[in-house]
Amino acid sequence: MSHSTKRGDGSSHAALNTEHNETSPNGEISPDGIDRRGFLKCMAWAGTGLVWTFAGGVPVSRVFGQRMHSAKQSDFSFVQISDSHIGFNKAANADVTATLQAALDKIEALPHPPDFLIHTGDLTHSSKPAEFDTLDQMLGKKRQVFYVPGEHDTSVDDGKMYLDRYGKGSQGNGWYSFDQHGVHFIGLVNVVQLEGMGRLGQPQLDWLKKDLTGLKSSVPVVLFAHIPLWAVYPTWGWGTSDSEQAFAMLKRFVSVTVLNGHIHQVMQKVEGNISFHTATSTAFPQPAPGSAPSPGPMKVPADKLRDVLGITEVSFVVQRHTLAIVDASLSGALIQPGSAA
């Protein structure tokens, strides 16, 4: 998305921060770095990733690699990919189709194939028919894919081409919901008629209120949209101006998970009953919030590129109200700082 005059579709790969000063309710440092007393500071994680487990609404974190013993017993799983930017061919990554293919190969190699994929936007870089065609050919028909658009998918025609391809059964500019194994998923669109930051708009908020009506508060809810629904860095437009209206509707639910893309870096926050998570890109990294004059594609050494690109695997154990999120880089190596493009 863009902040006033700048497009902020980029992603920061986030400077590695391994020292968390968050505290437990009694004021002591908790082993998972979570301040359970209130609003969490934004936490950036490296490509080795972090596993979030939600047991009874209480978040517990594990470093990627410390897989849950119950993983084989999960009810179902899905994978989030984001910001493939098909058509981009500049210095930050001259072959985005190759890195997307690497991500898809990584998904195929998972020990337990996911039930479906979620793509959180910026499928293409320029909304060109050939770019959409390439993406469709690469994702193929092996499993179901749920999409939401990024601003790069709507920049030419306000998303008409995107809706013609991926909007069947959706409402408005492409929002919709569905249910899987007792979990309610909601795809939101916050990239149309941008006003400095992401925006949902009143028609979509009215639809969301109706969609949530009748759901029991015990039903796990997963929202996914392109631009972060939380204020990651408003100076760069990395947030959604009217998201608080949506969150007010979600307070009654025991477990709410929000998945976003757009900033091309893994960042997490827990606030009350809501867990926020942004994903890496499969195309290119971007600078950490505030670390450069503006967001944009960031060039890193060629042998480090796949360290800062990746996928997100999500598993659910519904009866235990448990959710686990695992971020994996394409190489499996630690994310390293890079230089601005």
Question: Which residue stretches match the model-derived regions?
Answer:
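Active-site neighborhood of phospho(di)ester-bond hydrolases with catalytic His/Asp-centered motifs
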Residues: 81-82, 117-121, 146-151, 224-225, ...
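Extended active-site neighborhood of metal-dependent phosphoesterases/phosphodiesterases
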Residues: 64, 70, 128-220, 242-257, ...
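C-terminal/domain-terminus segments
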Residues: 325-341
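N-terminal secretory signal peptides and thylakoid transit peptides that target proteins
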Residues: 22-54
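N-terminal active-site segment of His-dependent metallophosphoesterases
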Residues: 34, 42, 49-52, 59-133
